[in-house]
Amino acid sequence: MRATVILVLWLSALAVSAAQTRSVFPGTLDQHPAIDYKNATAADPASQLQRVVEGGAPLTFEGEQGYLRAVLSRLNVPVESQILVFSKTGIQHPFTGPENPRALYFNDRVVVGYIPGAPLIEMASHDPRQGVMFRTLAQDASRAAFARPDRCISCHLSSNSLDVPGILVRSMSTAADGRPMPQDGSFVIDHRAPLEQRWA
């Protein structure tokens, strides 16, 4: 009984603390000065790669895969980590589907996304201060151009990521062409999710 009371009091204190934080700082936490997501100098692996390339270091462009192998090599992301996403999700969703899945490669700090025929390589890279930073690299042999599109956080900034930019894995029903069908329900996936929710 005593343990239950202590747990309830502790959870209540957390709720009050969260409410106080929200009332002191209106807006999403990515805008908080401690994070300053859009303006602070980033120190994540993808931003470091961007600075090196923009400083003059070459990035090899190879055939249909473009910069993919060079990016994986520079970021120490193993090719063997590949997983495939068959749904039409992400900022390049028109290019993905059951016949042309998005390949994701990852290590402990970076996720690299590649879609055959798509104009961009996608990167989600962990910064020790700002959290997950989202970048793209144009598949243009004449110039390795990096960008930080705001539209990534339209999905990757929510209560599911604790109101800061973060990685989100969700399982949901899809139509035959890969279009998501959220009306049929969805599950946010992490290490606690039961196997029957990880089917999509």
Mark where each language-model region is.
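Short, conserved acidic/polar surface loops in the N-terminal third of protein domains
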Residues: 96-98, 135
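Bacterial N-terminal signal peptides
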Residues: 5-15
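Sequence context surrounding c-type heme c attachment/ligation sites in exported
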Residues: 111-200
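Conserved small-residue
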Residues: 20-92, 100-111, 122, 194-199
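Flexible loop/turn segments at secondary-structure boundaries
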Residues: 92-94, 162
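A generic alpha-helix preference that emphasizes hydrophobic side chains
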Residues: 16-17, 152
